[in-house]
Amino acid sequence: MSGLLTRWRQFGRRYFWPHLLLGMVAASLGLPALSNGHETAAPAKATASNHNPSKVNFSQLALLETNRRPSFTVDYWHQHAIRTVIRHLSFAMAPQALPVAEETSPLQAQHLALLDTLSALLTQDSTPPVVIRQAGYIPSSYSAFRVSAWISQVAGIRAGPQRLS
């Protein structure tokens, strides 16, 4: 009876809990993070009388995008679960003691690279990525594209008076 319990405990430690934790982390990565603990509802202005499915309102696209993808929030328990999964994976994929004369296989090299990446993720400071928005710069000598100017440059056809310079 004790052998069965020992095997069950080993199974739980090796397979069940890490996979359950990994599934919880994977499921929580797919869920949207709600900022400030409340859900923002989209304004419902469309009624049955003026709703036309073929008509698209482009002025509300930015609003829909912000409601669909709320701001990035760092949840302590979510981060803790991810770190625990990374720790489990790093211990599971730790290289075994190998003789020096043996050649390392490509699979082992991939495991070592993944292990280095996971350890870097564990030791890095956990700050969310910041989006840097840059305004587009338009040079002052820029002139708008005109079909007539393009035709005159490419085909040598000129329509209208010459430019006085």
From Swiss-Prot:
Q: Which domain of life is it from?
A: Bacteria
Hey, what's the signal peptide range on this chain? 1-37
Cellular compartment(s): Cytoplasm, Cytosol; Periplasm
Q: Which UniProt keywords apply?
A: Cytoplasm, Periplasm, Signal
Q: Name one GO molecular function term.
A: translation regulator activity
GO cellular component assignments: cytosol; periplasmic space
Q: Which NCBIfam families match?
A: PRK02943.1-1
Q: What does this protein do?
A: Regulates secA expression by translational coupling of the secM secA operon. Translational pausing at a specific Pro residue 5 residues before the end of the protein may allow disruption of a mRNA repressor helix that normally suppresses secA translation initiation.
Record-stated family: Belongs to the SecM family.
What's this protein's name? Secretion monitor
| Organism, as annotated | Klebsiella pneumoniae subsp. pneumoniae (strain ATCC 700721 / MGH 78578)
Q: What is the lineage of its organism?
A: Bacteria, Pseudomonadati, Pseudomonadota, Gammaproteobacteria, Enterobacterales
